[in-house]
Every structure is written in C-alpha cells, then in structure tokens.
C-alpha cells in the first residue's frame, strides 16, 4: 500500500501478551469493540517515533505492563461500520509479546483482564472477524489482510493470508 493511500487510514496497534499457552485479554470499554474481549492498543501520538513506540505506550496505558520484546505479527486493513467516521478505515499493526515488566492492571479502557488458554478461546466473546486472524497470530503465523464490516458488524468481505513481508516475520 502506498504512503498516499496509508495517509487516508487511521493507524493503530493491537498487542497480545503471551505467557506459555495463555494470552492476556480484557473487555474493551470504549469505541470499536466495546463489550468484547481484545488485546491492548490504540492510535499513535505525536511523541511516538514508530509504531513499536505506539504499541509500547498503548499497552502500558491500557494494562500497565511495559512490553520488552514486541513482535509485529500482522497488519490488517479494517473498513469498520459507518457510525465510526473517524475510525472507519484503519490499518492495525498487530503485535505479540512474551516479556514485559510490571503486572497487569485494569484501566478505564480495559476491564476484567485475565489469562485465557489460547486453544480454548471462545470467539463468541470477540468481534466477528477476530476468529479469522487472532488464532493464526497466537500460533506464530504472520498475517496481512483486509476485513470489511457491514454496519451491523457482520463481515462483508475478508482476505487474510500468511506473509513473511513484515519486519519481524522474515
């Protein structure tokens, strides 16, 4: 995707801390995905020098841990329901981390944080398209794709593929 096209999209991060066979998730309280389980992340701030900085800052803000070894495992373009005008078109950079400092603590954005066994995730507690990429990322695959939602959050179109074309996936 060219830089001119990327400029028309909101950039965001999503991080999944992993400990052994479990992933840290929490219930999102605001914006896209409110009421559903998810990892931790958000949009860049002017002080962030890279998308890795955004990932580290947002994970610290939302769950209180400082990730040490984040790996970029995915890049997905989302076309969200029209009610989210500012967040309608997004490029989400998806990370995993297996090392961090601190203990998870809840925030006003993320509640009910808990460790979930990766092989037992109940995807009825996630946004509909999450089942298309989260299991692959948590199993170590790197993915790129596009997901388009209808206004009722049903999946309109999707295309997810394994890639080696990300910084941490060569």
Which residues make up each language-model segment?
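Conserved N-terminal beta-strand and adjoining loop/helix that marks the start
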Residues: 1-24, 43-44
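Short, solvent-exposed loop/turn elements at beta->coil junctions and helix N-caps
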Residues: 3, 75-82
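Short connector loops/turns at beta-strand edges and beta->alpha or beta->beta junctions
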Residues: 29-32
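A positional/architectural concept
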Residues: 34-38
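Unchanged
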Residues: 44-68, 79-136, 157-170
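Short, active-site-adjacent segments that bind or coordinate small-molecule cofactors and metal centers
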Residues: 137-159
């Amino acid at each position: 995707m060219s830089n001119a096209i990327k400029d028309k999209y909101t950039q965001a991060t999503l991080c999944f801390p992993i400990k052994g066979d479990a992933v840290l998730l929490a219930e999102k309280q605001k914006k896209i995905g409110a009421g559903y389980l998810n990892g931790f992340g958000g949009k860049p701030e002017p002080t962030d020098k890279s998308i890795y900085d955004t990932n580290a800052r947002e994970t610290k803000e939302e769950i209180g841990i400082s990730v040490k070894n984040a790996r970029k495992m995915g890049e997905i373009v989302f076309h969200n329901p029209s009610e989210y005008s500012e967040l309608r078109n997004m490029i989400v950079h998806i990370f995993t981390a297996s090392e961090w400092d601190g203990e998870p603590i809840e925030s006003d954005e993320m509640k009910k944080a808990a460790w979930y066994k990766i092989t037992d995730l109940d995807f009825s507690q996630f946004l509909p398209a999450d089942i298309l990429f989260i299991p692959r990322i948590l199993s170590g695959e790197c993915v790129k794709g596009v997901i388009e939602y209808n206004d009722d959050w049903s999946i309109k179109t999707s295309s997810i593929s394994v890639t080696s074309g990300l910084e941490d996936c060569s």
